[in-house]
Regions:
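Conserved mixed alpha/beta catalytic, RNA-binding, or beta-rich assembly cores of soluble enzyme
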Residues: 1-44, 49-215
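C-terminal functional extensions of proteins
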Residues: 217-219
Length: 219
């Protein structure tokens, strides 16, 4: 996940095949450090500079006006709506990831609804990825309930091309065995699976990252 040009460069140098832009607002497309281009050309410029596919996150939740603001605070241009998905596709986005940032409050039912809507609208133009890296503020969907086999099957039926799930060892209660079951389900249904790190292990030491990578491989 990257938010500025330096992070884009680091991801490419580390071997990334896909650049995922977190908190990218389709109404206000900004990537700090990018050469000056028209807003609608922002994604195309990233692709030109890197030669990589570009993904963005869209979150199926409402914008809250409770006065609390943080880097994760949802904006209209980051919501998982058909209008925003069409804007993203027009900008050149290759993949839309339907998920939730920390504390936003995205549940799996909302992901399913948004996935079905976006699949109908732009499913033939972009890769649709669905799932969660963590509970996203939904306590009833923690541990193995972050993503169950039933959730996975529902996402796939709604049009997911890629199933997103936490990497084993990154969130409490999400084991290698559970990940393996979900990955098997995805592959049997003819879609891809993507294990992810969306928690504090992003800044962990090399040995920890190596262990997580091996668990993902075994799953």
């Amino acid at each position: 996940e990257v938010e500025n040009l330096d992070m884009v460069k680091e991801a490419v140098e580390a071997g990334a095949d896909i650049i995922m832009l977190n908190i990218f607002d389709v109404d206000h497309p900004v990537i700090n450090g990018l050469p000056e281009v028209a807003p609608e050309d922002t994604i195309h410029e990233v692709k030109r500079l890197t030669g990589r596919m570009v993904a963005i996150k869209l979150e199926p939740a409402a914008v809250r006006n409770d006065g609390e603001k943080s880097v994760w605070s949802l904006t209209e241009g980051r919501r998982a709506t058909v209008e925003n998905a069409k804007k993203a596709a027009d900008m050149g986005v290759d993949m839309i990831v339907l998920t939730g940032n920390p504390g936003v409050g995205v549940d799996n039912k909302a992901i399913t609804k948004a996935l079905a809507d976006l699949n109908e609208a732009v499913g033939d133009r972009v890769i649709l990825t669905a799932g969660k890296m963590h509970a996203s503020g939904i306590l009833s969907e923690a541990g193995e309930k972050i993503l169950t086999k039933e959730d996975a099957e529902t996402f796939i039926e709604a049009g997911a091309d890629v199933l997103l799930l936490p990497a084993p060892g990154t969130v409490p209660g999400f084991t290698m065995e559970h990940a393996a079951e979900l990955i098997k389900t995805a592959h049997e249904k003819g879609v891809l699976a993507m294990t992810t790190i969306g928690t504090s292990q992003e800044g962990a030491d090399e040995e920890t990252i190596r262990q997580i990578a091996l668990m993902c491989k075994m799953a």
